[in-house]
Swiss-Prot record:
Transmembrane segments: none annotated. The gene is nadE. Deamido-NAD(+) binds at R140, K173, D180, H260, K261. InterPro entries: NAD/GMP_synthase, NAD_synthase, NH(3)-dep_NAD(+)_synth, Rossmann-like_a/b/a_fold. This is NH(3)-dependent NAD(+) synthetase. GO terms for biological process: NAD biosynthetic process. The lineage of its organism: Bacteria, Bacillati, Bacillota, Bacilli, Lactobacillales. Mg(2+) binds at D52, E165. Its EC number is 6.3.1.5. ATP binds at G46, I47, S48, G49, G50, Q51, D52, S53, T160, K189, T211.
């Protein structure tokens, strides 16, 4: 088995999908998790205005609405959370996403004060924090807020990780990578776009240039620029196609570098890192 084949197997990627079937599978998955854990009543998800949170949010709202209809339990709720750092430049996109999702509840938690307070504390301790590191602090603070909300509402936190992010490790460890349930896992970037099209989302939600937008000095930095490889190449690789040797090497290098993000904290019994 080649490394490409092994990665495809581990991430559960299909070369061809039926978007409607994948929507149904994700909704049923989200419903089944709450039904299996009757002490949980809500899903919580941060909404950025990009493709991934728009899709995960819509799937979550669909699952919750079906659960309420099937059980008669009005405690089932989906809570969408806006988590800007100060003023978000593309706030209009986030509002479009909320209009598409139509969440039961929408909260806004501005993380700027918490992030800046953490930076001041670190600087007082004698550390100078890089802009890149600050970006990861933002991502982790967003998850702190989401888990605080989930803790108060008997909830579980949804993550937006999908196959194209997972293979490259393009997420913050214990930040956006720290969630309870991943309804998009197995899907490539273009497959996620196909699901949004099937859900009749506004094209702006899936045609927008993907960006983590974590660094102050590189606002709106495109994912593909940061990764040095295009989502088309990543998706082709994950769907089993042949791509350029250079792109394949870069993707597989990201895979190896990001292995620690896919595991629980390393124990003496682990050998994947050796």
């Amino acid at each position: 088995m080649t490394l490409q084949e092994d990665i495809i197997r581990q991430l559960g990627v299909k070369a061809v999908i039926d978007p409607k079937q994948e929507i149904r599978q994700s909704v049923d998955f989200l419903k089944a998790y709450l039904l299996k854990h009757p002490f949980l009543k809500t899903y919580v998800l941060g909404i950025s205005g990009g493709q991934d949170s728009s899709l995960a949010g819509k799937l979550a709202q669909m699952a919750i609405e079906e659960l309420r209809a099937e059980t008669g339990d009005e405690q089932y709720q989906f809570i969408a959370v806006r988590l800007p750092y100060g003023v978000q430049a593309d706030e209009a996109d986030a509002q479009k996403a909320l209009a598409f999702i139509q969440p039961d509840q929408a909260l806004t938690v501005n993380i700027k004060e918490a992030v800046d307070g953490q930076l001041r504390a670190l600087e007082t301790a004698g550390l100078e924090i890089s802009d890149f590191n600050k970006g990861n602090i933002k991502a982790r603070q967003r998850m702190i807020s989401q888990y605080a909300i989930a803790g108060q509402t008997a909830g579980a936190v949804i993550g937006t990780d999908h196959a194209a992010e997972n293979v490259t490790g393009f997420f913050t460890k214990f930040g956006d990578g720290g969630a309870d349930i991943l309804p998009l896992f197995r899907l490539t970037k273009r497959q996620g776009k196909a699901l949004l099209k099937a859900l009749k989302a506004d094209p702006s939600l899936y045609e927008k240039v993907p960006t983590a937008d974590l660094e102050d000095k590189k606002p709106g930095l495109a994912d593909e620029v940061a990764l040095g490889v295009s989502y088309q190449e990543i998706d082709d690789y994950l769907e089993g196609h042949t791509i350029s040797a250079e792109a394949q090497a870069r993707i597989e290098d990201w895979w190896h570098k990001g292995q620690h993000k896919r595991h629980l904290p390393i124990t003496i019994f682990d050998d994947f890192w050796k």
